[in-house]
Amino acid sequence: MEFSGRKWRKLRLAGDQRNASYPHCLQFYLQPPSENISLIEFENLAIDRVKLLKSVENLGVSYVKGTEQYQSKLESELRKLKFSYRENLEDEYEPRRRDHISHFILRLAYCQSEELRRWFIQQEMDLLRFRFSILPKDKIQDFLKDSQLQFEAISDEEKTLREQEIVASSPSLSGLKLGFESIYKIPFADALDLFRGRKVYLEDGFAYVPLKDIVAIILNEFRAKLSKALALTARSLPAVQSDERLQPLLNHLSHSYTGQDYSTQGNVGKISLDQIDLLSTKSFPPCMRQLHKALRENHHLRHGGRMQYGLFLKGIGLTLEQALQFWKQEFIKGKMDPDKFDKGYSYNIRHSFGKEGKRTDYTPFSCLKIILSNPPSQGDYHGCPFRHSDPELLKQKLQSYKISPGGISQILDLVKGTHYQVACQKYFEMIHNVDDCGFSLNHPNQFFCESQRILNGGKDIKKEPIQPETPQPKPSVQKTKDASSALASLNSSLEMDMEGLEDYFSEDS
């Protein structure tokens, strides 16, 4: 991989050449990109792809895949993030280019562990399934050929000749349906799953597969190719990570939160200390609700709890003076000497507001940060209840929150499937009595803001939109350099030679 200071350029192609580069709205990503892009575009494409795949995950849990609602919402996300989704749309080159490059960027970030690879493959498969489902029938054969799949649609004459055998082997087909259904001739080895289920007609080493069943075979091929490609990329990853300009981004990308950071406090001072107890039961997510309850009962929280809860309170509008008063009043109830609080704990509170030390204005923790870092130990109350609680204790907690038995079962099923944020979103919908909250939950402060918007009839203070957040804290003093600050500090004229990436995606590396 090479970087240079040459003037940034993109591959410029004439109309026909551009279309030839990306003939379809979906692909198997067989060839890595070979153009130069700026590091800023590299970062932006990566962030947008993460947003897209997380939307794919959330929608796949919230809706039945393939339903009209699922299709409509996923298409909306693709449109919003400017990725390709349909054939025959005008000026599709740029969305398809973004799709191609961003996929390979995320391979670098998500090849680093088995868990990351598994998640990445599943979301990419679901995305491919959606795109294939809306691919016009007259484009399918070309797509299969471009994807190097030896699947060929048989002629009407062949279909008529084998009609009886095909219908007998495919329970959902009738003679009438067969007339409108494309049948594909596929090598037997590629249709083993259908053969095991006795759902396919075999003849001379070939399987005759209806279009409705070919999707599973295509997805299996895609999974196998992508899994192998990620393993090859992982072998070459040390060479990529040796570049100090890419290493921070790749290390943080798979675990980064890309939404609003809730550090811009348009509602500073709008929350009074007297309101917190009531707000904790009405508008706090379970992670903050349990921290508030523990603080009121024990008059103390350990460092992890103070950081998680303190920054959340800061994000919903508590001023520095209010925060000092809130924590001091509570800790003194626990028999702490006021002087000890002033000399020790008050410094940490001022520090979190950017008034001490390196003057870092810390941002509230996102769901991903809470889920993935600093798990609670005995005596701790921080963390995510859906991720870190014993299922039976979580069930009891939900019962105390007056969640219905059916609702508790839904939430526990989501937790069992490791969909912790979706479980919290389901909790939000239940306590606010809404069927669809209309957003993907990614942040405790988002939970609070959306709750207040519902309870106040949409009249709560809306925060100004800000740039995507990178791992906390905001400035580049955290650990080494966070992903955004590392890239932002580079001269924007630097470019990345995408041709160099080929070494990391091929078997010869």
Curated annotation (Swiss-Prot):
The keyword Transmembrane helix does not apply. GO terms for cellular component: alpha DNA polymerase:primase complex; nucleoplasm. CDD domains: PriL_PriS_Eukaryotic. The modification Phosphothreonine is found at residue 470. Residues 253-270 are annotated as: Interdomain linker. One of its GO terms (molecular function) is DNA/RNA hybrid binding. Keywords: 4Fe-4S, DNA replication, DNA-binding, Iron, Iron-sulfur, Metal-binding, Phosphoprotein, Primosome. [4Fe-4S] cluster binds at residues 287, 367, 384, 424. Signal peptide: none annotated. Residues 461-486 are annotated as: Disordered. Binds 1 [4Fe-4S] cluster. Its cofactor is [4Fe-4S] cluster. One of its GO terms (biological process) is DNA replication, synthesis of primer. Residues 300-442 are annotated as: RNA:DNA duplex-binding. Residues 266-509 are annotated as: Interacts with PRIM1. Heterodimer of a catalytic subunit PRIM1 and a regulatory subunit PRIM2, also known as the DNA primase complex. Interacts via (C-terminus) with PRIM1. Component of the alpha DNA polymerase complex (also known as the alpha DNA polymerase-primase complex) consisting of four subunits: the catalytic subunit POLA1, the regulatory subunit POLA2, and the primase complex subunits PRIM1 and PRIM2 respectively. Within the complex, POLA1 directly interacts with PRIM2. The RNA:DNA duplex-binding domain interacts with the template phosphates at positions -2, -1, 1, and 2 positioning its bases -1, 1, and 2 for duplex formation. Interacts only with the beta- and gamma-phosphates of triphosphate moiety of initiating NTP of the primer. The side chain of His-303 mimics a RNA base that would be paired with the template nucleotide at position -1 via a hydrogen bond, thereby facilitating the stacking of the initiating NTP. The interdomain linker provides flexibility in movement relative to primosome platform composed of PRIM1, the N-terminus of PRIM2, the C-terminus of POLA1 and POLA2. Together with POLA1 interdomain linker, allows for large-scale conformational changes of primosome and coordinated autoregulation of catalytic centers of PRIM1 and POLA1. It is proposed to move the C-terminus of PRIM2 close to PRIM1 during initiation, then move it away with the 5'-end of the nascent primer during elongation. Regulatory subunit of the DNA primase complex and component of the DNA polymerase alpha complex (also known as the alpha DNA polymerase-primase complex) which play an essential role in the initiation of DNA synthesis. During the S phase of the cell cycle, the DNA polymerase alpha complex (composed of a catalytic subunit POLA1, an accessory subunit POLA2 and two primase subunits, the catalytic subunit PRIM1 and the regulatory subunit PRIM2) is recruited to DNA at the replicative forks via direct interactions with MCM10 and WDHD1. Belongs to the eukaryotic-type primase large subunit family. This is DNA primase large subunit. The gene is PRIM2.
